[in-house]
Amino acid sequence: MALKILMSWDILPGREQEYFEFVVREFIPGIQRMGLEPTDAWFTMYGNHPQIIAGAEVPNKQTLDTILQSSEWLALTERLLNFVTDFSYKVITARKGFQM
């Protein structure tokens, strides 16, 4: 059964340019190398919700567990924390369309 990891965070004020460069050059290629397939990304314009919600899929729980326990995942998410606050993620069953 395919699973989706939903990640959310807020971009640190004044770090937007560096954040976008990191995401495009390192974060997305990094999660792809680990086996996560990006599916969607959402930007919250209004309201009291995370500024960014991003999703990525894996084919099964074993693959996801391996990724989430890897030193690569830890290093990549720690690096992301240089540019964001309130990073969190949850794992759900993958479906088509927007998921929260």
Model-predicted segments: where are they?
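Short, flexible segments with low predicted structural confidence
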Residues: 2-3, 35-36, 52
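Active-site-flanking beta-strand signature of metal-NTP-handling nucleotidyl enzymes
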Residues: 3-10
